[in-house]
Amino acid sequence: MSQPKPILYYDERSPPVRSCLMLIKLLDIDVELRFVNLFKGEQFQKDFLALNPQHSVPTLVHGDLVLTDSHAILIHLAEKFDEGGSLWPQEHAERMKVLNLLLFECSFLFRRDSDFMSATVRQGFANVDVAHHERKLTEAYIIMERYLENSDFMAGPQLTLADLSIVTTLSTVNLMFPLSQFPRLRRWFTAMQQLDAYEANCSGLEKLRQTMESVGSFQFPSSSAVVTEKVE
C-alpha cells in the first residue's frame, strides 16, 4: 500500500521551513507545498489554527499525522524516506549526538536569531540594541566553532539532520553578523553551500533579506554576502 503524499505548510522565509525544504530536495521526496504568508498573518486563519494551534510553520500533514516542529518533521521524513541512511543514524549514541544538536538549534541558536529578528520587525532597526544581540549570536558562533574542532560536520564525520537544521538558521544570522572570524564554521558553511540541496535554502533566504530591509529597515552590513569562497 502506497504512502499518502506529505503536505508541508510553509513560508520559505522561515529558517526551520528551509531546513525541511533542504531535506525534501536531498531525498527527492514528493511533497505537496501549501504557502502560508506569515507576514500577512495567514497562520492565524481559522482553518490553519484548527490544524496547528501554535500558528507556526513548518507544519507537516502525513496521513493522520500532524507535526508542528521542524525537528520532528526532519526526523519523521528521514525515518520514512531515508531508512537505513546516515542522516538520522541507526546507532543509539550517534543518533543522540544528532538529537542533541537539533535541540541546540531550536533552544539556543534559533531562539537567539528569532529574538533579534522579532525585535527588529516590532521596533524597527534603529530602536534595537544590536550590540546585545550580536553578543548573544556570537556566543552561538563560538559554540559551533568548538563543535567542529574534531569533525567535518556538526555531529561527526557525515552529514546529518543536525547540519540541515543548523545551516538554514546560520545562513540567516550570517546576513546580519558575518561569521568571517570563525574558520572552521566558514569551512563547514562553504561545504554545506556546495550541496545540491542547499539550493532549497537560497530563495527563502533572499526573500527574508528583502522583507527585513522593507519591514524592519534593517541595515545589513556590506560584508554579509553569502560565503562562496573555497576555504583550504
Swiss-Prot record:
Protein species of origin: Drosophila melanogaster
Additional comment: Member of the Halloween gene group.
Mutant lacking the gene: phenotype: Embryonic lethal. Embryos display severe developmental defects such as poorly differentiated cuticle, failure of head involution, abnormal gut looping, and defective mouth hooks and dorsal closure. Trichromes are absent. Embryos have a higher sterol content. Embryonic lethality, defective epidermal differentiation and trichome development can be rescued by supplementing embryos with 20-hydroxyecdysone (20E), ecdysone or cholesterol. RNAi-mediated knockdown results in larval lethality at the second instar stage, which can be rescued by supplementing larvae with 20E, ecdysone or cholesterol.
Pfam assignment, any one: GST_C
The reaction(s) this protein catalyses: RX + glutathione = an S-substituted glutathione + a halide anion + H(+)
GO MF annotations in UniProt: glutathione transferase activity; steroid Delta-isomerase activity
Keywords: Detoxification, Lipid biosynthesis, Lipid metabolism, Steroid biosynthesis, Transferase
EC numbers, comma separated: 2.5.1.18
Protein's name in the database: Glutathione S-transferase E14
Gene Ontology BP annotations: cholesterol homeostasis; ecdysteroid biosynthetic process; glutathione metabolic process; response to toxic substance
Tissue localization of expression: Expressed in the adult ovary (at protein level).
Gene that specifies this protein: GstE14
Gene Ontology cellular-component terms listed: cytoplasm
